[in-house]
Amino acid sequence: MRHVPFLVLALGLASSQAQAATALFSLAIGYNGVPAEGSASGAGSLNFADDDALAVHELARTVARRSVVLALPDRATQARYPSSSETRPPSLVELRRALATLGADITRATAAGDEVTVWFFYSGHGWLDSDGRANLTLADGALSQDVLYNEVLPALPGRTVHLMIDACHAEALIRPRDVTAETVELSASEVASASLRSRLEHLPNVGVLMASASNTQAHEWDDYQTGVFTHELLSGLRGGADVNGDGRVEYSEIAAFLAAANREVTDPRARLTTLVVAPKLYPRVAIVDTRGARDVARLQGRAHHLGRFQIDDQRGNRLVDLRAEFGFPVDILVPAGEPILLSNESGETTIIAQADRPTNFEDVSLEKAHTRARSAMVDAMRRGLFAAEFGPSYYGGFVDSADKQMVPVDLSASGVRFAAEEQPRTAHRRAAWSAFAVAGASTVAAGIFAGLAARAYGDFQNTSLERPSIAARDRYESYGYAALGAAAVGVLSGALGYWLWHHRDDARSAN
């Protein structure tokens, strides 16, 4: 009986741990307007910042406990996003109101023992003031660097906060004030530098996902009807970046996914600068866990046969772009019970995926190709974006050469094998089929010649005349040798085909 209290305590602890959950809260802001002041005041209005915020909000509604969106959607956006009715103005006043609401929810969830994760997303104009400090444009003013770090982020007391910004000069938001504010392309080593990380020293629970582009056309794209970075980010968070198949998208995975998405864009006007920094305290925290997603269907399986493909919903919103490596199984979240369009450069098909059962990519067939006219820059984006294959092989190479502070996911525990180990042995298999065909034809020929030889041997046995006997013997020997030769070719071809079918390169076998 003396062990009963300990048993009760253990059961209580187990119960409390079982009840603990991961709670996501999301705040998405999108504003198309131009800044009232600053070096970017001459910039034109954006077209899709409101769409960006609503696209993030649409995904957040399926995985978050609460999602708030601040935007001024135009009529076209309202028609494409049913959740437009939930928007509030993207102003400092509404931002502070949303922070108060979400802060209270986060505090309650934390008190209940939940592990709280927060998304803070912004899309719009970024600009630099006369002192070189970064600002984000809102309808009633500016969200300054100081307000962001000293007021906004501290008001979101989650275990981890994921700061996602799609704006010009976004990278200046994490630079110390003594670092030049000139927008430059950031290499992996520069992203890893202490000068870029020092801004987050007092916020070690905050991770950063940012992008800026050399011009507005690269920042936004009519094909996507959203910002390019936002679309790439959401393609990854919907499951495209989940390289080890555990349902969680971590920072190293999304960084590799973004790198692959932009790798083949050769036109510098169309190239994004992306920056991904994981929270210092939790480098392997998940940005999203798709396993508990609600009101969604899943497209699953190996999709390499589709090449570079895209998924659009029934209202024309681009949900995902991806080009999967050979053998890489993907698991993509899509709306349940409504038509979605799956397409690539050669064709398309409409699918209605159900929440209670996944749809397998390998069961999908496309038809009806289509083409469109395009400009040089648009052509560069269409050829380059998502042209590189993504999967375990690309991910492994990326993390090996990237920021050493980036903590990679464990691929061995997931059962996911590197694509290099599963590369299609297409040439060997084609040669094997050819060898098998020769073996089959030779076997048939051997049988025919053997039959002819048997008939000639019968003629030889049944005749008593010298000349017919000699002729029958010659036929018998000729057909016999032909049968033996064909049989030998068949055996050798069959053996060669077997070897080719099971052949692996020495380097792959060693792996």
For the regions a protein language model found, what residue spans apply to each?
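Acidic, glycine-anchored loop motifs typical of Ca2+
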Residues: 44, 88, 245-251
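Pro/Ala/Gly-rich low-complexity, hydrophilic intrinsically disordered segments
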Residues: 256-432
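Cysteine protease catalytic core and zymogen-processing segment of caspase-like enzymes
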Residues: 47-53, 93, 106-109, 114, ...
